[in-house]
Amino acid sequence: MPDPCCNDKCECKEGECKTGCKCKSCRCPPCDKCSSECKCTSKEECSKTCSKPCSCCP
């Protein structure tokens, strides 16, 4: 049986898997924009550089 959170993908929370979700295919989309607090020029860079991308974004 798959984890309850794993339907098509895990439920996401602040750029990471929702607490308690265990899913190999969990890929939470990064935020559209990083704020100035995150020194990133693109959302891809933000998702790699920032520990919690969505918390870094407005």
Swiss-Prot record:
| Record-listed a divalent metal cation 4 binding positions | C31, C34, C50, C54
Residues that hold a divalent metal cation 1 according to the record = C5, C6, C17, C21
Region listing for Beta, in residue ranges: 1-29
Where are the annotated segments for Alpha? 30-58
Q: Which UniProt keywords apply?
A: Cadmium, Copper, Metal-binding, Metal-thiolate cluster
Residues annotated to bind a divalent metal cation 2: C6, C10, C23, C26
Question: Which amino acids does the record list as binding a divalent metal cation 6?
Answer: C40, C46, C50, C57
Indicate the family of this protein: Belongs to the metallothionein superfamily. Type 3 family.
* Its biological purpose: Binds six divalent metal ions. Known to bind copper and cadmium.
What protein does this entry describe? Metallothionein-2B
The taxonomy runs: Eukaryota, Metazoa, Ecdysozoa, Arthropoda, Crustacea
